[in-house]
Amino acid sequence: MKLETKAQGLRGSLRIPGDKSISHRSIMFGSLAKGVTTVRDILRGEDVLSTMQVFRDLGVTIEDDGDVVRIHGVGFDGLKAPQNKLDMGNSGTSIRLISGVLAGQDFDVEMFGDDSLSKRPMDRVTIPLRQMGVEVSGQTDRDLPPLKMHGSKSLKPIYYELPVASAQVKSALIFAALQADGESVIIEKEKTRNHTEDMIQQFGGQLQVEGKEIRISGGQTFTAQEVVVPGDISSAAFWLVAGLVVPNSKIVLKNVGINETRTGIIDVIKDMGGKIKLSDIDQVAKSATITVETSELKGTEIGGDIIPRLIDELPIITLLATQAQGKTVIRDAEELKVKETDRIQVVADALNAMGADIVPTEDGMIITGKTPLHGAEVNTFGDHRIGMMTAIAALLVQDGEVDLQRAEAINTSYPSFFSDLEGLLHG
């Protein structure tokens, strides 16, 4: 598709679609609780719809009237063997977390996904699950999907130090540990997003978190809850950057989730001199209104323990760095290589094709700014975040057209992205 270029300014306010991580987990916990859980403001992107369909296939009744989702929970002991293979679509969250849910189920399942998911390694989940007594096999020595799995009703608890900083792996092991005989200990490499831990407590469960150590006992039961999903900061990130780099812009984003494990991008924007303000802060819902406006930016260094707090925002942060004076270095981000695409290479290739100065490294990128951007053809390779990054980059283009291939990938997490963009262009 041909993208909008030569933006004169972005103005207006947006309510950001529901957080993808919390939407996935609300379906999972709602299914595993006893009673009817209601979820408001859920994200209806393709990944979340995949999770919803999988739990229906496992025997859970889920009603969606377009406003509220109602989940008739069955508990861990009420899940049924599916009649067919479980389709995870493009969703790494779905296949990894649901592997943990199914670890304690005494039936055969096969989980598969699209071409992109079929290239993503699952060994980081399958290795510890095997230690707990699960039979699971995938393709190649990295256990690529499809995965065949038979869980165990007598799962062994685990003491496990995560070799990578991954909220998905941590969450998969937490779901398995909830079904194990005894106490499990999971130790993170770096602190990652804690929505799973928060939701266990919201649904009446218990766990102990001290620093990077999580202790969790098996045999717990959950009680249905009312969940309101805040806006997704990973989706808001595209508008935060657009408001900072497009001339004559001021954007107000309402009801954005500001869980402390997800707000690395706000810290980076402040470090780079961006004009950003938080207001209407709700400490309980962990949400706020965020306002940004066009700013003079300077390069910065991004690495260490901030990386898990902004891993999904690094593509759009890279674009931000191309519009900052001086050098920006991103390091310790090798996890980008096993996302929907190798995001180090694909981001660098896309923005360099448009005139940026980006050198990919083994664990990140070196970006030299400020560079004007020009027209190019860019392929998302099925990665939603590459698509949205390119659409924001196109707004800065004064010379030539930007042709985005496979733009439909954006529907994975933000189906209303282009209509929201139109609103800001004419705000």
Curated annotation (Swiss-Prot):
HAMAP family: EPSP_synth. Keywords: Amino-acid biosynthesis, Aromatic amino acid biosynthesis, Cytoplasm, Transferase. GO terms for cellular component: cytoplasm. PROSITE patterns: EPSP_SYNTHASE_1, EPSP_SYNTHASE_2. Monomer. The gene is aroA. Pathway: Metabolic intermediate biosynthesis; chorismate biosynthesis; chorismate from D-erythrose 4-phosphate and phosphoenolpyruvate: step 6/7. This is 3-phosphoshikimate 1-carboxyvinyltransferase. GO terms for molecular function: 3-phosphoshikimate 1-carboxyvinyltransferase activity.
